[in-house]
Amino acid sequence: MIKNISNLGDAALYCDFGSEVNKEINSKVIRYFKSIQKENIDGINNLTPSYNKLIISFDLRKKNFQTIKKLIENLNITNDDELETNRIKIPVCCDENFSLDIKRLEEKLQITRDKIYEKFFGKEFFCYMTGFIAGMPFLGDLENELQAKRLETPRVKVPKGSVGLTEQFANVYTFESPG
């Protein structure tokens, strides 16, 4: 299930599940993450899951790379393990102050903002991870036609509560920040 396990500095391990971003790979990452948490392995300090990677930080005084690697490889993880999920409704305001890219999207897609909103709100998203800023969800599987490239020059300030469309993700800004 893990394609490669390598060093990440002297006290961390990098588990690579593949380069694609999809639910199947992300589910594998989460299964390993939850299983390692459940095992409560002495010497593991921190687990950091992402779309398709898992970073495991460890205490060199208790465990080394080879020991942790062997423990990870010997975990009995199956796709049968049910993943607990939650549905969360996120209120979104489409006011001009929060829809910073709507005009750019209208031009790119050659459709009205109402049609953009209809496509966006007509979908249920999957949260691949949170990060960049505290609690910011990376909501994936955005329709191809709604995908937008990153801005060449990021904004200095994006208001809290704004929704950004970047590549295949929709992100909700949990704090005012650059973006």
Question: What would you call each of these model-derived segments?
Answer:
Residues 1-179:
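Glycine-rich active-site loops that engage anionic ligands at enzyme catalytic sites
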